[in-house]
Design a protein with these regions (language model features):
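Acidic carboxylate motifs that coordinate Ca2+ or other divalent cations, activating on Asp/Glu
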Residues: 43, 92, 96, 141, ...
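Blade-edge motifs of beta-propeller repeat domains
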Residues: 13-30, 62-79, 111-128, 160-166
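Extracellular carbohydrate-recognition regions
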Residues: 166-180
């Protein structure tokens, strides 16, 4: 769970009866607005990504496998990281990271090298505010495409992944007059 104040990722343990108990908390590096969990480094442990809306960064926190996390490693963006998501966008078997910057009017894509080390790959610009990104297979070709949501401009933009591992995206659709903060896909 991301908690903006006091800037923590908190781990809650399920008791099996629908209730949870606090297990641990660790600083997220800037006030988390959204967290997404996935195995970022292929070690079988769940790791956490955080969009730190109180700062100009996103954070990666590696799971230790015992319900605790290692300290946050932050990646800077323009401002107001508002959402985070994961998906194997380059088809190499690991999770890549996309981070939306509300104030920076963009979405930044970070490619995973397979060991959980992320490098900036490319940027998609928003008309007004990058509010959410959703990786999903738009065209049923087996690779992940992107839906980008711009809450202030009321638009949804669909990008088709044209080259798999080379991460070349083609604009395919943009719809205006929609208010969208978040979405999910199977």
């Amino acid at each position: 769970v991301g908690v903006r104040t006091p800037d923590q990722i908190r781990i809650l343990r399920g008791l099996g009866d629908g209730t949870f108990v606090f297990r641990s908390g660790i600083p997220a590096g800037g006030g988390p607005w959204m967290v997404v969990v996935g195995d970022l480094d292929g070690d079988g442990n769940l790791d956490v990504t955080s969009a730190n809306g109180g700062s100009a960064n996103g954070a990666l926190l590696r799971g230790n496998g015992d319900g605790t996390l290692q300290p946050a490693v932050t990646h800077g963006i323009a401002s107001d990281a508002i959402s985070t998501d994961l998906g194997d966008l380059d088809g190499d078997g690991d999770l890549d990271w996309i981070l939306a910057s509300y104030g920076g009017q963009r979405w930044d894509l970070f490619a995973n090298d397979g060991s959980g080390v992320f490098a900036f790959d490319q940027r998609f610009f928003a008309a007004e505010a990058g509010s959410c990104a959703l990786p999903f297979d738009l065209d049923n070709d087996g690779d992940l495409d992107l839906a980008l949501f711009d809450e202030l401009a009321d638009t949804i933009r669909l990008l088709q992944n044209a080259a798999g591992r080379d991460l070349v995206f083609l604009d395919r659709f943009e719809q205006a007059d929609l208010t969208a903060w978040s979405a999910s896909a199977p």
